[in-house]
């Protein structure tokens, strides 16, 4: 009897390329390999460009320009550069920094920087208007090197005073950088694809430059009344009028609604004092409605004061006074600001999210108006309190503490609306191209074109002089021949 031999078959182990997984089809795996190759190639190209001597020289020129002009750097590059080296998020070996900076004369500075690059031998240089009016971009060899933005003179002065100076370059102070990030996180109709990146940067900034205020236990979170008005009655008349008009609360009253999250030391300061800051699409109409209600309730000495916008940071607003007391400010929204809705005494009340409130409070810190200046410590303490509340409850997505709410109030400027505005301005200015306003809106400046034009003018002038010289010589020659003919030499000369 023959014994059957057992056949030992080796197990086959299928190895997958690194980007592929076992559940992928052949085609998906092939595409994954292709994408990996593309990414590797892209990384190598970026590293090569970022480390080229030409790009290093271009970056150095922008930094020297910042030192010379004392413009103030903001945005991602500013956040990155004020952080400790180990916390910086830009990879200088693979990324070319795009410098954003504020200027009091952005158009002139854009042209000046472009001229400097051209004078250094860079032929492809262009300064042009950005999407937003007041921003100008400088491109060198088709690489965006600088975004130069106009800033209201009062804001510029305040920011410059608190700027961080590193290696001779001015960087926007942390609270203003923080404000701009809170503003972006409070606009759900804006570019939400940037939110994750912004939150990461905000977290880093908060870690190394925490929001701090001094002696907040001595600071009242609400404005106190100077006169003998019936403060509690005033409070409820104004509050109810605002609720009826559907405003979004973000000032002293809104902060008082967070009192349940305050420590005992802070909680005692909250009372029914008329202290309101609100958002309304038609602030003048809203303020007039409040004044009308106040007069009905016997408060005759009322006054409304209009304040202009401060750049694009603090919107146009109206102050409501009763006697000598300021009881409310009504602001026009500058974007679509998010809010949460809660119930108070059976009424729906809109309260700004903490991100919205912080964006306004931190902006107010940099204004020079007296009514903001006298309350700077209060604003900073309120901002610190709200910031601490948000940090401790940042995963609590309910009630007042809900973050990244999609409900928002106001009109958000879109790319389409900005382009429509530019198209309208072009139609208005197209026949006035020499007008400074046209250049302000539609700058397209190429130093090479200017140089070529100057050469052409010189050539035309030279040609004109040459023609004039030839014409003069012909006239002299003709007069000479005429003279010789008259004197009898003509026959001899032309025989």
Model-inferred region functions:
Residues 55-107, 233-284:
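Active-site nucleotide-donor binding segment shared across nucleotidyl transfer reactions
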Residues 61-66, 113-121, 238-242, 290-298:
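Hydrophobic, Leu/Ile/Phe/Ala-enriched alpha-helical segments that form helix-helix packing faces
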Residues 116-157, 293-338:
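Conserved catalytic core of two-metal-ion nucleotidyltransferases
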Residues 17, 145-227, 326-454:
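Active-site and adjacent loop segments of nucleotide-processing enzymes
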Residues 1-57, 165-233, 455-467, 473, ...:
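N-terminal regions immediately upstream of nucleotidyltransferase
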Residues 107-112, 284-291:
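Short, conserved charged micro-motifs
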Residues 2-7, 70-78, 82-83, 92-95, ...:
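Compositionally biased low-complexity segments enriched in polar/charged residues
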